A protein has these predicted regions:
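Extreme N-terminus of proteins, especially the signal/transit-peptide cleavage junction
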Residues: 31, 59, 74-78, 424-426
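Sec/Tat signal peptide C-region and signal peptidase I cleavage site
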Residues: 50-54
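Outer membrane beta-barrel
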Residues: 67-260, 324-356, 361-379
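Bacterial N-terminal signal peptides that target proteins for export
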Residues: 5-40
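N-terminal acidic, proline/glycine-rich, low-complexity intrinsically disordered segments
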Residues: 1-7, 55-56
Length: 438
């Protein structure tokens, strides 16, 4: 299964393809009180149960098929799809003389997803995580679909902002999301409108939500103020499928609001805090974010880049200042075994079968990224002692797709911190993750 949200996320603007149906598979008809229902088991559908999430998109490659389980009415107006995936990982810090990171094996994620459609125009998506002995509702929303150009979404959902954050977690190139997600919102609860215009050349999203801090999610609000989000992506050559840039997309996202509450802590790729504010610091008044972003896939290649800026007011005691954080990343990949990138995923031409000499597909990945904390946080004493102002990171790795259900990821990531971090040594992480989805 391929989905952090197991859905069809339109990453180019967050707009889904309306009324998309999974086809193929084995169907059985049964009589019901009100209508005939076809039970479809192991249907060939969109990448792992990623069939209804509305933020997948045109900056994505053609669809990949993979088994899903679904029940659908003969008319296609009603559908229930069941999916899920698990990710088990091993994390090991190399040359960790300061013992900041604990080497461990862990169940990173174990998610069950229900999604579907009712009465033709209404779609829903529920994503629950059972890992780490906790029960967490990651997403819960429903859409009212009027046309491909207009969809109304209500509930807990990903904020339409960072490209990296909008990627489905089971389809990311790397085990860890980029440093840029430290200064971008995660999930928010609110109302969003999204859709495609000009036959898919332009995709848009606009949302009003509670307004989480950088890198955080907002279950509910602690004040009356709200955040407003907007995201637009453009595919200039989308109408010409033969154009070499037909799948290129670029755009910008922005958010703004007046908020008061907790401030963010920025985490390294090893999930260790490298910047924290001094005790007693809170966010206050205005907060503005914006992010230009671009993505391109063609043949064996898939790459993307984004730059994120978060500017907000913070206060501690009698000290108040505006702090400006920025982060950027450039990521790329190449399929070594010749397969074509499909919807940010790889479908092996021949599935893993050692007796037949088949081993699946192999993909090489690389990324360089940087995060800069606002200088004012250090100049005015708002940063905690030992906090780092800069973090530079590069990662290289391999993704092994044994078949459409099983994926292995091996990453080595090195992060270097600036002199403000005192004696903090570079972080060297070797990580391995096994993923299974159905």
């Amino acid at each position: 299964m391929n989905g952090d949200e197991l859905t069809q996320m339109r990453l180019n603007a967050g707009a889904p393809r309306a009324n998309q149906r999974v086809t193929g598979g084995v169907g059985t008809t049964m009589s019901g009180a009100r209508r005939w229902i076809r039970a479809v088991a192991v249907v060939l559908g969109l990448a792992t149960a990623n069939v209804a999430h509305a933020q997948e998109a045109k900056d994505a490659p053609p669809k990949v098929t993979t088994p899903v389980f679904a029940i659908e009415s003969d008319s296609g107006d009603n559908r229930l799809q069941i999916g899920g995936f698990l990710q088990a990982e091993g994390r090991f810090a190399l040359n960790d003389e300061q013992q900041r990171v604990t080497d461990t094996f862990a169940m990173r994620r174990f998610r069950i997803i229900l999604q579907g459609k009712l009465a033709r125009h209404f779609e829903f998506y529920w994503n629950t995580d059972f890992s780490n002995n906790t029960l967490t509702l990651r997403d819960a929303y429903f859409d009212t679909v009027l046309s491909p150009a207009f969809r109304l979404r209500v509930g807990k959902q990903k904020a339409p902002f960072s490209y990296d954050r909008l990627l489905i977690v089971s389809q990311t190139l790397f085990q860890e999301r980029g440093l840029s997600t430290n200064v971008a919102p995660d999930r928010d609860t609110g109302v969003q409108v999204l859709g495609d215009l000009a036959k898919g050349v332009v995709s848009y999203s606009a949302m009003v939500g509670n307004g989480p801090a950088d890198g955080q999610l907002a279950e509910f609000d602690t004040n009356d103020a709200k955040d407003v989000y907007g995201r637009v992506m453009v595919r200039p050559w989308a109408h010409n499928a033969k154009h070499p840039l037909a799948t290129f997309a670029a755009g910008v996202a922005a958010s703004g609001g007046t908020q008061a509450g907790p401030v963010a802590t920025f985490l390294s790729p090893g999930r260790q805090p490298f910047f924290t504010y001094a005790s007693g610091t809170t966010g206050v008044d205005r907060r503005v974010r914006w992010s230009p972003q671009a993505v391109y896939f063609h043949g064996h290649f898939w790459g993307y880049a984004e730059w994120v800026r978060s500017r907000g007011d913070v206060v501690r005691g009698g000290v108040r200042d505006t702090v400006d954080h920025t982060s950027w990343q450039v990521s790329g990949s190449w399929v070594l075994t010749g397969e074509t990138v499909v919807e940010r995923n790889i479908r092996p031409r021949v599935a893993f079968d050692p007796p037949s000499g088949h081993w699946g597909a192999l993909q090489a990945v690389a990324r360089y990224q940087r995060l800069d904390v606002g200088e004012n946080a250090f100049r005015t004493g708002l940063a905690a002692a030992g906090a780092s102002q800069h973090a530079d990171s590069w990662v290289a790795g391999l993704n092994w797709y044994m078949n459409q259900l099983v994926k292995w990821q091996l990453n080595f990531e090195r992060t270097v911190f600036d002199k403000n971090a005192g004696t903090r040594k570079p972080e060297n992480m070797l990580t391995l993750q096994a993923q299974f989805g159905l």
